[in-house]
Amino acid sequence: MDPTVRRNTTRRLPTALVLTTALLATGCSGRADDGPEPAATESSATPHGYVEGAREAAEEQSRLLLGDPGTGASRVLDLVTGKVHETAPVTGAAGLSTDGRFGFFHTDRGAHVVDGGAWMVDHGDHVHYYRAAIRDVGDLPAGRDAEIRSDVGVTAVTDRVGRTTLYDRTALEEGEVGPARTLAGVHAGAVVPYGEHLVALSGDDDSAEVTVYDREGSPVASPDATCERPRGDAVTRRGVVLGCADGALLVSAEDGVFTAERIPYGQDVPEKERATAFRHRAGSDTLTAPAGRRAVWVLDVTDRAWTRVRTGPVLAANTAGEGSPLLVLETDGALHGYDIATGRHTARTEPLLTGAGKAATGAGAPVVEVDRSRAYVNDRTGRRVYEIDYNDDLRVARSFGLDIAPGLMAETGR
């Protein structure tokens, strides 16, 4: 059944006006993509952007990967068709990450890989959007604390002690986990594929040096830069952002030459208020991260500037980038909007989280996912996902009822 959309005509949405739809239509893992096709581009014998086994679409094909930490049940919610697809259960899943196409359910036994069947390819001056079958791929041998990062060519899995294993991402696209290669050495934090290379931090957690490898794992000329007590990373159009004790380090490449630029906080920041868990919209150069309990850091990578926005008690935060509000899910269960430049509180929803005061933290905590026009919030206890129009005073655009408790959520199609 298709979800029903009802527009909110007031600044704050009464919950009685949210019309929800039970979306219990399920599929099976590896099934062919179903439902009405989105608008597709014209094709030819070998058209530009052609990908075998996929359909090219004219717009973003967003899907939500969902997991129930209690039962291990997993689902994929297609935000274009409104259908829910059932995927293989993942018992003991304690976390969920994504590279924009694949979801990685983290367990003590390894990381279970699900192909969300939606992704984009950014050529700089234009973008291609694709959709394909949703399917379970297999398991990567990694612990629940493993950091997984990908680009179009390679997936890097770094374990908790800094050992990194490399996988051919094209094998994942073909539905299997291919042979693995081990990257020499031990690294502080995740190894990040970027610019057809691998960006890493070599050394211990107190002070690590930027090291760049080629795809075969051989060191290449690296910028002379260090990062003290590294925690957190993100890939933007401007380069790789690495979280350091004094702010961030931006590692970028031009014509195969890598450079590093420091972006300091500009003030003394206590350890517990550092930016260590970055969130952002794919393709955006504006990052967010909690700044302690009652504030959020916003890093404008383009302007090389940090802004600290005071908020209520933070559960999760994100933003779509320049011109969009800072979105903060607070412990009152409501999503709040803030003007990044002024810090002014601009909007809020009614409480979205069932039993807001008891919302989980850490593994299974709610998140805020953001794409080009909407934000998504998962209500684990209420078995629901909310779609928010952040350009319309945080209007609740849709509400998806589910047959699982979606404590884990990540968006693909980006």
Cite the ranges covered by each PLM segment.
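C-terminal motif of bacterial Sec signal peptides marking the signal peptidase cleavage site
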Residues: 24-27
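Bacterial signal peptide processing site
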Residues: 29-32
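Repeated scaffold domains used in trafficking and secretory/extracellular systems
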Residues: 45-57, 89-102, 131-152, 181-196, ...
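Short beta-strand elements that form the blades of beta-propeller/WD-repeat-like
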Residues: 56-69, 95-114, 145-166, 189-205, ...
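A short beta-strand motif characteristic of beta-propeller blades
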Residues: 80-89, 122-140, 173-183, 217-225, ...
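Acidic, serine/threonine- and glycine-rich low-complexity intrinsically disordered segments
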Residues: 196, 202-324
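Intrinsically disordered, low-complexity segments enriched in Gly and acidic/Ser/Thr residues
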Residues: 295-380
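Blade-level signature of beta-propeller repeat domains, shared across WD40, Kelch, NHL, RCC1
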Residues: 380-414
